[in-house]
Regions:
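Active-site donor/metal-binding and catalytic loop motifs
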Residues: 131-133, 194-197, 219-237, 245
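A conserved acidic beta->alpha catalytic loop
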Residues: 37, 44, 52-60
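Short aromatic/hydrophobic "clamp" motif used to bind/position activated sugar donors
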Residues: 95
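Short, flexible, basic/aromatic active-site loop/helix in glycosyltransferases
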Residues: 146-172
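N-proximal low-complexity "stem/linker" segments adjacent to membrane-targeting elements
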Residues: 1-37
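Conserved donor NDP-sugar-binding/catalytic core segment of glycosyltransferases
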Residues: 107-147
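A short, conserved alpha-helix in the catalytic core of glycosyltransferases
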Residues: 111, 168, 172-190, 196-224
Length: 300
């Protein structure tokens, strides 16, 4: 049983362009930096809705004083409830999922909104592009470009001067935050699946649910950029076996889904086609063996 969640809406004078959902777990310095960057560097007016997990470091008091909508739990309830609960307070037609350890670059919102305006439907999943300070295995991130590994040593002026100078293509997959969905689609898939609490593999599961309701426009927008400090709050929590849960739920591994469906990290080429039947069959056979082995280990 999770800790009881309380809901605290704050009225706005006008309808926001985006409702930005940010779960935070005793990470006040990063949350301040994140929200201040949204306020400074956004072209449009947005609603920020925070889920405060515990908030014993002063987060709860700070959020109350910022005239923000927020939800609160006295214990950490993970990212699934941490996104689903603030989503109930969203006032915009567009929901943005964000971590609390981002610095949003200027006009991040404009570039996402322009992508949305180019479409004539709501069946999309569009996200910004992360800049990280250390080398990464992910081709969908701009790295390494070190502007500071913590908020305390963040070189904001250098970042603002250089962030837009790194050449990078739009990319397939859109599995990273900040991620924007139409509220109707978010409601249609039921948000994040809480059986993945505290949250490992909840994002790929959400992407699979989007695929199943017909979303085929998965785009990472290069010009919409955030700096990611990689403040790993997951190191403080007992993790669920998300990879195994995903395999048992969907009958395929995350890697198969990323490679065959989302084409994660490849140069963006438009709407994502269905997987190649022959290649997909081979990967599914491998995953079926993995799944049977996982079930056998569970029941042994």
């Amino acid at each position: 049983m999770i800790s009881k969640i309380s809901f605290h809406p704050h009225a706005l004078n006008e309808k926001p362009v985006f409702s930005i959902l940010i779960p935070s777990w005793n990470n006040l310095d990063y949350l301040k930096c994140c929200i201040e960057s949204i306020r400074k560097n956004s072209r449009y007016q947005h609603q920020v809705v925070v889920h405060v997990n515990e908030g014993k470091d002063g987060t709860l008091e700070w959020v109350k004083n910022q005239s923000l909508s927020y939800t609160h739990s006295e214990e950490n309830v993970g990212v699934c409830y941490g996104f689903n609960s603030p989503a109930t307070l969203a006032l915009s037609d567009y929901i943005v999922l964000s971590d609390d350890d981002y610095y949003f670059a200027p006009d991040w919102d404009h570039h996402l909104l322009e992508e949305i305006k180019n479409l004539d439907h709501m069946y999309f999943c569009i996200c910004g592009t992360m800049i990280e300070h250390s080398p990464t295995l992910y081709s969908s991130m701009i790295a390494p470009h070190n502007f500071g590994k913590t908020v305390k040593d963040f070189d904001e002026q250098k970042f603002l001067k250089e962030f837009s100078s790194f050449p990078f293509d739009d990319w397939n997959g859109a599995n990273w935050y900040p991620l924007v969905l139409h509220k109707n689609i978010w409601n249609l898939i039921g948000g994040l699946s809480t059986e993945f609490t505290p949250g490992m593999a909840s994002d790929p599961d959400m992407m699979m649910k989007l695929w199943h309701v017909g979303v085929r426009y998965f785009k990472g927008v290069s010009q919409s950029r955030v700096y990611h400090f990689v403040s790993r709050s997951t190191a403080r929590v007992k993790k669920n076996d998300g990879n195994k849960q995903f395999l048992l739920k969907w009958g395929m591994s995350k890697s198969t889904f990323f490679d065959m469906h989302l084409r994660m990290g490849q140069k963006f080429m438009g709407y994502t086609p269905d997987p190649d039947r022959n290649s997909f069959r081979i990967k599914l056979l491998r995953d079926k063996i993995k799944r049977l082995f996982s079930v056998w280990k569970r029941d042994a």
